[in-house]
Amino acid sequence: MSKNIRINEIPSGERPREKLLFYGAQFLSNEELLAIILRTGNKDSNVVELSYRIIHSVGGLNGLFKASAKELMEVKGVKEAKATQILAMCELYKRFKVSELTQVKISKPSDVAKLVLDELRMLRQEVLILINLDTKNKVISKKEIFKGGLNSSLVHPREIFREAVKDSAASIIICHNHPSGDPTPSRDDINITTRLKECGKMMGIELLDHLIIGDNRFISLKEKDIL
């Protein structure tokens, strides 16, 4: 097969688009759903086979939503056009999730963990997330503030509270991950928390909690009486 294979050229029993219309999207595999987005395969693979290769090359759905264009194009059969299709799909999903945030009210650390655990637990580098809250503890926004090795000399309260003021936050929560999988707070974690707590008092924007995310688990510094 020297030409790109389109969905309507795949045997009827294997056509993801037709299966979706007949059975519903919930009955399709991840690979079949991605195949509908990509539309075509290549000379070596039909579109479902290509979708399987992509998803499994980047580490499943979690990896797919974190993959860069460069990482996607390292998969055999994926060039710029297909990489941008995937990135656009992932960005739409992320924006949808952000729009849902305004419906979330925070009453306990596990509420916060639900917002960030899946996003942070598998990352290979440290990332700090800021969650801005209104006077009723409803989420206003969730923003990535720092990426890379975090320590108390690099994390400046100015960057965090600038975003809090911009969103008219009444209070904030910060979250970051430990790539090691162990969420035990380090000395730097405690120092950062103390600095942010003091700055928050001066600015009238309370730091409610600092969550550290590990491998499918988390620690709340508020629950540990560190905050």
UniProtKB/Swiss-Prot annotation:
Domain of life assignment: Bacteria
The keyword Secreted is annotated on this UniProt entry: no
Residue ranges occupied by any MPN domain in the UniProt entry: 105-227
Family matches, as PROSITE patterns: MPN, UPF0758
Molecular function terms from GO: metal ion binding; metallopeptidase activity
BP term (GO), one: proteolysis
UniProt-annotated binding residues for Zn(2+): H176, H178, D189
Pfam family, one: RadC
UniProt keyword terms in alphabetical order: Hydrolase, Metal-binding, Metalloprotease, Protease, Zinc
Motif extent (JAMM motif): 176-189
Family: Belongs to the UPF0758 family.
The protein, known as: UPF0758 protein CPE2144
Lineage of producing organism: Bacteria, Bacillati, Bacillota, Clostridia, Eubacteriales
